[in-house]
Amino acid sequence: MKITLIYFDFPFWRAEIARLSLYLGNIEFEDLRITSEEFQRVKANGKLDNGIKIPFHQLPCLVVNQTSIAQTGGIARFCGKLSNLYPINDNLSAAKIDQFIDIATDITVLISSTKAEDREEIFIGELSRKLTILNNSLELNNNYLVSNNISIADIAIWGLMGWITSENIDGIPLNILKYHKNISSICLLVDKHPKINEWIKKTYPANYLRGNF
């Protein structure tokens, strides 16, 4: 099986959830990182310069044996099944994982759709509300979000919070997680995973602040 993950040269959770799933599962894949200039052409014509089709003209995109797959959730579940980070025969656990992917997406859309000058307002309002609800929903007992083993749910929340507290978003305090100890705990647990640390050392910029957990 030939697998290619297409995204920008940046460790954003929407792509890292797939990259890390494959890496943790020791699954060989091409980590294809394109420029913002090429992405402008993707938005216009729905394909890379090399001819690979990009469904919905959006990234990330996963190509499996010349079949292109779009959307973060679908890509994450496919990669998670390959690497045993998403259950194949346990529908309840799968649904529990899905809810964390969906809330991560909701929070991302909330931030990304807000102008920088309005982010202080959403931090005080809707973002704080969502983070409080998420924090209060977690029952960790020193384990990962859904079971004793890491899943794509954990990678999603870790990656999202790493982005929020990485100095890349104006108007949101870097210490936001001090008010949300359960979220902070799961992020710290994921952050200690040996394979994740291997990936960070291999691919992250040397000066990248990946999270203030």
Functional labels for PLM-detected ranges:
Residues 1-131, 140, 145, 149:
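GST-like domain detector, emphasizing the conserved glutathione-binding G-site
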Residues 18, 126-130, 134, 160, ...:
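Alpha-helical packing segments of well-folded alpha/beta enzyme cores
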Residues 74, 182, 195:
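Residue-level recognition of oxygen-bearing side chains
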Residues 97, 145-184, 190, 200:
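GST superfamily/GST-like fold recognition
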Residues 100-103, 158, 202-206:
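Short acidic/histidine-centered micro-motifs embedded in hydrophobic/aromatic stretches
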Residues 106-110, 166, 212-213:
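Secretory-pathway/luminal and periplasmic proteins that interact with or process carbohydrate-rich
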Residues 137:
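Acidic, Mg2+-coordinating catalytic module of metal-dependent nucleases/exonucleases
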Residues 189, 194-213:
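C-terminal helix/juxtamembrane-tail motif
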